[in-house]
Amino acid sequence: MKKTLIIKLFSILLFSSVWTIFFSQSKPYVPVSKQLYDTIMEKDSLLFDAANSGNIDKLKTFFTQDLEFFHDVGGLANYEETVDNFSRVAKNYSYTRRVLIPESVEVYPIKDYGPVQTGTHQFCRLDKGSLINCGTFKFVHIWKKTPDGWKISRVVSYGH
């Protein structure tokens, strides 16, 4: 009788532990559309290739003219101010590199507009071929499908 009670209690404890572990874990991200996810990841790569190389003419083609860039420290910037900010970084801080943390990126479609991309990235200093002094920050990009291709219309950059 005592042995049966111990087995039952152990079974209940084991079952409740497995139940808690199974149902308390968040589900891993799975893109709604793999094609959309891959497209936005490619555009993100091209955007920051331009930023990291200081190619401002290329970089500004990734933004809509009505861009709103919200930065938790810098405040709100429009298209012209954003391009000026990137130009200043390219001129005065050309050693700055953006490094995307790919596993942090999620892309969700917004009906009749385009996707929202969220993720985490680092900005680092390139010194003698090594990335040092990296800061890790979060971002939200709202992409819009335009006649000229995918462009970012809204940016939220935070966690600085």
Language model segments and positions:
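Bacterial N-terminal signal peptides that target proteins for export
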Residues: M1-F10
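Short, low-complexity N-terminal intrinsically disordered segments enriched in polar/charged residues
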Residues: K8, I21-Q65
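Hydrophobic h-region of N-terminal signal peptides that target proteins for export
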Residues: L13-F23
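A solvent-exposed, acidic/Ser-Thr-rich amphipathic alpha-helical stretch
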Residues: K34-T39, N55-Y113, T120-Q122, L131-C134
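A short, structured loop/turn motif at beta-sheet edges
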Residues: V107-P115, W143-G149
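Beta-strand elements of well-folded, non-transmembrane domains
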Residues: F123-D127, W143
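Short beta-strand edge/turn micro-motifs at domain boundaries
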Residues: T136-H160
